Amino acid sequence: MNKNIHFVSADEAVKVVKSGDHIHFSSVASAPKVLIEALCRRGDAGELRDVRIHHLHTEGQAPYTDAKYEGIFFHQAFFVGGNVRKNVQAGYADYIPIFLSETQKLYRSGALPCDVAMIQVSTPDKHGYVSLGTSVDATLAAIECARVVIAVVNKHVPRSWGDAMIPLSMIDYFVEDDAVLEPAHFSEPSEIEKAIGINCANLIEDGATLQMGIGAIPNAVLAQLGNHKNLGIHTEMFAD
């Protein structure tokens, strides 16, 4: 760990959040759980109002979408995952329909404010850079546009390269947490989903190029492709 980094507690870091702020969370396995928990404690204490929370899918719980935080937190999702779907349907969260490739434009164009970016990063290298690991997507643009950037430094975050590498100078507050990253959660497909998977797989010819989405149906289709040949992949994600 870089000895030049000054760490603060999660509770200390989230004090920078003000009522009316727009917050971005890094996504999927990189969701900054320790910061989310600290932010919810501020909500429980009645210290915040009308805070907007934005992110793509996150693994794990999304407590800020709970009905008890009505008027305190409101989640506007770029992707409606299983952990927020019921609360979106109930009206305690909302969905911004947008292509994944366009999410960064929301922040960079100013169409969507970003006051605080809460992210999770790798430990720093000898050059003073950390990696965004499993979550670049809209997170890089959020970091560039935010008033304040809070980073959880976690030794379990993998060091991915390219646009994922950012200098320590882009981060305002550092919080240390070595919790194991949240894995992807997959349920066994239902009989209906299996049937859909079989029907779809029968339409796919050998040599086809695949673009896969996220969820039970794409996984059910993939499970039926074991005997296909020369399949290509051109996709933003691909499940196990």
Where are the regions that the model predicts?
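Conserved alpha/beta enzyme-core scaffold
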Residues: 1-240
